Amino acid sequence: WWADDLKAQNAIEFAHNKGLKVASVTWPVTAGAKGDWVIPEIWPQRGEDPDTVFLPYSSPDAIEIYKRHKNTLFDFSNPFYPDVFATLCSVDIIKEKKPDLFFLHLSALDTLRHKKGAEIEKMDEALDFLDDKIGEILDAMEESGTLNEYTFFFLGDHGQLNIDKEFGINRVLKDMGYIIDNKNWKIMAH
């Protein structure tokens, strides 16, 4: 989650330090990153006050936008609620701030595939949902007069295959004597 865990300067801070107005919404490893409007990818647990997670690690100029939409963070009836929040925040930043560079991570499909595997029943639903969210962002750019000022990169962070069997590597390492307990180990997989 934490930007200060990175060993090199991230693209958000690099661009910000070069004088660009930079926004980032739910982009990985941005908690505490230096940018103009940063709302990090850091998720509160069920029942946890989202302010304790977001406020200390968002940029000061993004907090008002976060507060407008934080009520969407716990709509557990919608499996894609993090992307609803991210899109609402993104639309406001685009319309009100008009950043030079914008990073946005929509995670609906990735989250489903991590939980259910590559061949999921809800894949079409997730793709339709993401298509709608991208449409909302493009509409905001068009309304703000910035649509033709941006170049878009749509990325996936990894491929994925279905898992047929699991392998407990820490069990093997423990059996080999490399792990005694969680505090006494020579090798441990995470």
What residues fall within each predicted segment?
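Secreted, luminal/periplasmic, and some membrane-associated catalytic domains
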Residues: W1, E121, E136-H190
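His/Asp/Glu-rich, glycine-adjacent segments
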Residues: W1-G117
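Catalytic-core regions built around general acid/base machinery
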Residues: A11-F14, A126-F129, K133-G145
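Glycine-rich loops and low-complexity Gly/Arg-rich segments
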Residues: G47-D51, L127-L130, G177-I180
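N-terminal start-of-chain detector that recognizes signal peptides
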Residues: L73-S77, E125-L127, F167-R171
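Active-site-proximal segments of metal-dependent phosphoesterases and phosphodiesterases across multiple
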Residues: K115-D131
